[in-house]
Amino acid sequence: MASLYFVTGTDTEVGKTYCTAKTVERMRECGQRVGVYKPVASGCELRADGQRYSVDAATLWQAAGRPKNIDAVCPQRFLAALSPPQSAAREGVKVDTRQLRDGLAIWCDGDFDVVMIEGAGGLFSPISDDWLNVDLAIEMKRWSDQNGHSFELLLVAPDRLGVLHHVISTSRAAESAGIPIAGLILNRMDDHADESTQTNAEDLRRWCGIPMVASVRQPSGPLVVFSGPNGRNASGETSRETAGGVNFLNQTTIRR
């Protein structure tokens, strides 16, 4: 059965796609068969051949080695750079809420050890007229439990002053929804980092007890995975092994 990871952010434009792609590449280097699924994308480009091009979906597909086809990676693609339901409304249609979840099944056919699912925006951003991202994650976890797959959240947040509140509130909301968190990636979006970047990772490990905390030191730099003393997390427990024996990023530095 597959290990499923739902990637969400504390906001939009925090580097979810970059971090997801780097994670996918590392897992493939470790011998994992990785599928990628982006249920819906907005802000797509309309090509001359009439195809809708999502740079995020294409980036994930390329990182995974181009499995299946781009329509399986991202079956719903809209043009306006708005939230998915607003972007769809501009075209006189609605996001197909059920397809958001049902499109996952094609990636859980036994061909993949790991499936990375990238949401749209933050955990409480609307993804359709009926659901927020958290609602989709809950539905996917329910489906995963019924079909014998594991399901966890991977959180991406900007590494800057104020991130403690955003990560703690998001992680507690996820836990209240019954969604376990596999890890956190802090993305340093600005070359001029503030002083909080020296302590954010350690503070979040202590306050959240998240098993894995990583940091992208710049958008073009390496992804460095931090661990607690003796490879233990903030709660003192040995880090969980997921993704077919890979301890998520396994204290690995991923270089662009």
Curated annotation (Swiss-Prot):
Gene3D superfamilies for this protein: P-loop containing nucleotide triphosphate hydrolases
Any one Pfam family match given in the protein's UniProt record, by short name: AAA_26
Binding-site residues for substrate, renumbered to this chain: 42
Localization of this protein: Cytoplasm
Primary site of residence: cytoplasm
GO biological processes: biotin biosynthetic process
Cofactor(s) in the UniProt record: Mg(2+)
Catalytic activity: (7R,8S)-7,8-diammoniononanoate + CO2 + ATP = (4R,5S)-dethiobiotin + ADP + phosphate + 3 H(+)
Function of the molecule: Catalyzes a mechanistically unusual reaction, the ATP-dependent insertion of CO2 between the N7 and N8 nitrogen atoms of 7,8-diaminopelargonic acid (DAPA, also called 7,8-diammoniononanoate) to form a ureido ring.
CDD domains in alphabetical order: DTBS
PANTHER family xrefs: ATP-DEPENDENT DETHIOBIOTIN SYNTHETASE BIOD 2 (PTHR43210:SF2), DETHIOBIOTIN SYNTHETASE (PTHR43210)
Protein's UniProt name: ATP-dependent dethiobiotin synthetase BioD
Active site feature: 38
Annotated gene: bioD
Pathway connected to this protein: Cofactor biosynthesis; biotin biosynthesis; biotin from 7,8-diaminononanoate: step 1/2
